[in-house]
Amino acid sequence: MTHTTITFDIPGTVQLVDTQGVLDVKHGSEHTNIVLVPQPSSDPNDPLSWTRKRKTFNISWVMTWCFFGAAIISGLSPAYLQIEADTGISVADLSTGNGLMFLFLGWGTLLTQNFALNYGRRPTLVYSMVTMTFISLWTAYVKSRAEFFVNRIIIGIVSSPMETLIEVIIDDLYFVHQRGFYMGIYSWTLWCGAFLCPVATGFIAEDLGWRWIQYILSIIGGVVTILTFLFFEETMFYRPSSQTDVRGIPDQQRGLFGSDKSAIDTERSEDQKPQPAEGAASVNSDIETRTLPNRVNVALEKAFWSKFKLWGYQDDRKSKQLKQSLLPFYLLRFPSVIFAGILVGGILSWYNVVGGSLALILGNPPYNFGSNVIGLFYLASVIGVSIGCLISSWASDALSVWMARRHGGVMEPEHRLWLCFLAIVAHPVGCILYGVGASYQIHWVGIAFGLALISVTLPLGTSMAFTYILDSFKDLAGEGFVSAILIRNTMALVFAMPS
């Protein structure tokens, strides 16, 4: 006996767990009571229907792009004192330039995200990395405060896809019950790219001079551009909203998924048990099809060479570009978007405080550390970020599934937010250790420990906020990310300005 869900319009509320195995929809293969949200189509070009190997290969290159993109914009921080001595640009002005970069890293998404949503993820990533490579090379030759500010503004705009596009690609490739894990991986690559790069660039600045930081990063950017062009496939796929969700069940149907087992006949004969569609196991190990008739794929898979093109991905069925570019401002009316923006805004603000003050604190008495040792302090951040990502990636999905089972199989976007309580404790403790501890000139171990505690909360807040938007505003998630980033990076500029 099978049933089909009846929808009701609560954004983000979906039937995630088929507690009695009666829904006539596609399920996961490893956990066969997990309903696939969104439901994959029969089109072979649908990224949701790709094999696990193909998905992993593509997301790996996206994360590689993100890691080195974050590295390119973060490599200078250990060398601020050297840059000041060489160019006359003060550390305060360098910090202000860093703040301007983060401001336009957010506002630049109005351009780059709109381009990616209309013309494709692949051309956006390739064009962005090409431009970042040349701007990074230019940075080695800046000679004045004004030129440095312009340089930082431009690199902020062209590198902005790392802020909002990676989340959209995760949405293209993965189902609701898998997104938390990959959001955690994304947070790790983003923050560790920003933190590991200064570890290396501190030694580069000490041995070769600060300009070699930009030379080496430009070479890396060129290599990443070529690899992205060769190996990353386009993931943009038009999916009508009416076909994407298995939404929550109304109250009158909750008995089908609650504890009242007498409401349905759960006994099935062997020939009535759900069977995967023909070829399903060989096509995609993430998908099991239950009691669905076999369909003939009328769409043909793209030719191999067509996957290399950087044009022709626009779909006429999508909304107009002008209207789409204004949506991020419209979404600022919603409290959930404002909440997500303030959450990640507070996190980035404190990251800017750390990035702008670490060299000043550790390069002066009583510590007097060189650029190489200052760079090593970012290893504390890497440890903290890794712990935070482990919590946010694994626990986020596990918690949402567990909460859904407790609520008759229905998942709400707010179920993931319980993990934020960890950040509420760790973040203020880390800030006190780092800031107040430095003012009292405590041992450097205490400062490193405070840095690690602050860093634990970076992926927690980022992953929770963006996954919350993705779950709540599925059809407008790309624009919702832009809305949150506008709030976040505007807040970060205020914290980055010298007092």
Predicted segments — roles?
Residues 1-54, 235-324, 400-412:
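Intrinsically disordered, low-complexity terminal tails of fungal membrane proteins
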Residues 55-75, 153, 332-333, 337-351, ...:
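Pair of pore-lining "gating" transmembrane helices in MFS-fold secondary transporters
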Residues 65, 185-189, 220, 229, ...:
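Hydrophobic alpha-helical segments of secondary membrane carriers
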Residues 66, 129-136, 151-152, 187, ...:
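A generic transmembrane-helix signature of 12-TM secondary carrier transporters
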Residues 70, 82, 86, 99-102, ...:
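C-terminal transmembrane bundle
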Residues 91-92, 176-186, 371, 475-484:
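Loop-to-transmembrane helix entry/capping segments in MFS-fold secondary transporters
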Residues 153-190:
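Cytoplasmic helix-loop-helix junction between adjacent transmembrane helices
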Residues 191-243:
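Helix-loop-helix hairpin linking two adjacent transmembrane segments in secondary transporters
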